[in-house]
């Protein structure tokens, strides 16, 4: 596990070195990934999508696909690297604890390798160094192009009609108690609104909710980004000495 953790630090390092504040990049990149994840839950709800497996896995997959769709390759790699790095940090912190087999989310290192695999699988020729630096085993790497193709076919079957009709029904930012989170999420909202016409409007609130989390609330068509989650990411970036 420590080898994988160290590897992701190296994967992220070239892109992070160009930025003025690597800690801010780590926090922002993870906020982007989580926001896309919650949007996945929203689309599953609004489009009444069939999910053959765990919904959390489907939302994770969409997060990687949207990062690749919205961002240029170098920036997308940084986001995926920082997101995977966060999973590796969580796994390291939980060493010695009994795995939470009851949890709806996959184990942190499973999510780590899935993120790396799906990103690598979109362009194996040009992302081989990324996969190698992230210690993606050859056995898994051999299937990543197929995994990515299946993910694209599955999600884009439903995303493409939304893209064809864009712009249309929009995502909007409502309450925003944290300026940093609001700045990050506002840019994503603007970009997504240009690319997709959603089934119904989604509002996003950034506010304290008493826990480190983010939610999609179906009855309200609302994504809640907890300020505690960003605080947790800042603490994690500080502890990792980014």
What spans do the regions from the language model cover?
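Catalytic zinc-binding patch centered on the HExxH motif and its immediate surroundings
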Residues: 205-239
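Sec-dependent signal peptide recognition
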Residues: 1-7
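N-terminal signal peptide c-region/cleavage motif recognized by signal peptidases
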Residues: 12-14
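Active-site recognition of the HExxH zinc-binding catalytic motif
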Residues: 33-46, 60, 64, 225
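An active-site-proximal "capping" alpha-helix that borders the catalytic cofactor pocket
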Residues: 53-70
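Pan-zinc metallopeptidase signature
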Residues: 98-192
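Short pre-active-site segment immediately N-terminal to the catalytic Zn-binding motif
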Residues: 19-33, 48-49, 236-242
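Extracytoplasmic
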Residues: 29, 54, 78, 110, ...
């Amino acid at each position: 596990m420590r080898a994988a953790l160290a590897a992701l630090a190296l994967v992220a390092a070239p892109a992070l070195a160009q930025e003025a504040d690597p800690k801010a990049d780590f926090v922002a990149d993870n906020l982007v990934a989580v926001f896309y994840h919650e949007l996945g839950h929203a689309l599953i709800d609004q489009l009444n999508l069939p999910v053959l497996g765990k919904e959390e896995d489907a939302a994770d997959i969409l997060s990687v696909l949207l990062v690749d769709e919205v961002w240029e390759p170098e920036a997308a790699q940084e986001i995926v690297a920082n997101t995977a790095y966060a999973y590796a940090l969580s796994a390291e912190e939980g060493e010695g604890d009994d795995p939470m087999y009851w949890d709806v989310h996959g184990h942190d290192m499973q999510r780590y390798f899935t993120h790396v695999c799906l990103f690598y699988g979109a362009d194996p020729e040009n992302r081989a160094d990324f996969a190698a630096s992230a210690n993606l085993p050859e056995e898994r790497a051999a299937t990543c192009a197929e995994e990515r193709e299946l993910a694209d076919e599955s999600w884009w079957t439903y995303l493409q009609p939304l893209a064809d009709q864009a712009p249309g029904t929009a995502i909007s930012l409502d309450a925003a108690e944290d300026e940093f989170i609001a700045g990050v999420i506002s840019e994503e909202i603007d970009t997504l609104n240009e690319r997709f016409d959603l089934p119904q409007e989604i509002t996003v609130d950034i506010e304290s909710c008493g826990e480190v989390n983010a939610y999609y609330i179906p009855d309200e068509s609302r994504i809640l980004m907890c300020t505690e989650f960003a605080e947790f990411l800042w603490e994690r970036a500080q502890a990792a000495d980014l």
